[in-house]
Amino acid sequence: MNLVNYYSKCLIATFITYLTLASTPIVESGLVRFIPTLSLIVFFLFGIISFKSGRYARMGTIVTLFAFWILICAVIHPSIEGSKIMTLLKSTYWCWIYFIAYTIFVNRNDNKAKMDKIVMITTVLFALSFNYSHMYRVVDLELIGDNTVFYPLLLMPWIACVLNSSKRWIMVAILALCAITALKRSGIIILSTTALILYYCDFLYRKRLQFKTVFMAIMVMLGVFAVFQFKADTIGNIGQRFKLLEDDGGNGRDMLYEDVINRYQNSDLIHQVFGNGFDAVKGKNTMMAVSAHNDFLEVLYDFGAIGFFFYLLIHLSLIKWMICLFRVRSQLAFPVLISYVCFLVMSLVSHLILYPTYFGLLTAFWAYAECKDNELKKISIQ
């Protein structure tokens, strides 16, 4: 048993604790403020240890090459944060999480009851953390939303794997309240799309038109009615934000995209191929000191054509895997589809690459789902 498996419980607890506290004011004072940095260091070290087994995962080669390229970029390019070490730790965090998760789950018998309990507890913790941090944020709800909602929302693939459908939908309801409170258009899109996929999977795809199906449909409608009654003002604000898309260009995203594309086209061939460094879009020589709000553009600008190629390979690898899962009617097909919807929506209108805590939830899920898929294949052969 290697160190990763030996300390697996501690690593999982540290990961959940880090993500629970990351968005709260708690980490801004006292000794607690060192938790994010310590967590990044711990996962970096254990990620290197788990590399030997993690590289054999489905996306192991792609993630390995991408991680290696990110490390090179962190070394050769100046850091936007002023610390190359912190840039290195943050930019590669999701890679190490993928390797660690694969190493933990690859040789472990799946205890579904225990795993479901962890997912349920994590959902509650993330929801409480979001609401706590939301109360302390000065947010103009008519103009912007709360990004911390993505912590609970990116649990949707994990929730889709929970065996008990009633518990699944209770957790979805919890996430729905968070999404409505946050006023994030992308959050509403993720929740709506993934919830519809999950409902189709649970009650239509499997053709189970039973009392439970009808009861759940009624409960969903009652839940929607209740939300409209008690969150009428918030829902009105969300509707207004969607109406403003044409006028504000997605909070100025159209202007931002144009600026990033122009800067990339006007840069020399070396920077176009090798990039400008992690989070370089919001550098000094820009009309707006913000990131690209689109991972395709961000990766292209930060890591160049080489990094963009690796990023596209991740998308293609996931799409190919989904097709294979649906062909064999695997129970993991819809959870993996839900994970890709989260990945795609966030990549198109927001960020995952720049926020390691967000992306870590998805890469950990992909590693877990692959190990579970391999386990199901062995059972079917036997």
Predicted regions and their residues:
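Transmembrane signal-anchor hairpin modules in multi-pass inner-membrane enzymes, especially those
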Residues: M1-I72, D110-A113, C161-S166, C324, ...
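Hydrophobic transmembrane alpha-helices and their immediate junctions
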Residues: V4-Y7, S53-R55, A305-L344
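Aromatic-anchored transmembrane helix interface
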Residues: R33-V42, M59-A74, I80-I104, T123, ...
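Structural signal for the C-terminal ends of transmembrane alpha-helices
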Residues: F44-G54, A101-D110, I159-S166, L196-K207, ...
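Alpha-helical transmembrane segments of multi-pass inner-membrane proteins
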Residues: W94-R137, L143-D202
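A membrane-periplasm/extracellular boundary helix in multi-pass inner-membrane enzymes
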Residues: T181, Y199-L244, Y264-N266
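Long extracytoplasmic/lumenal interhelical loops at the membrane interface
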Residues: D247-F303
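Transmembrane alpha-helices of multi-pass inner-membrane enzymes
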Residues: L337-M346, I353-Q382
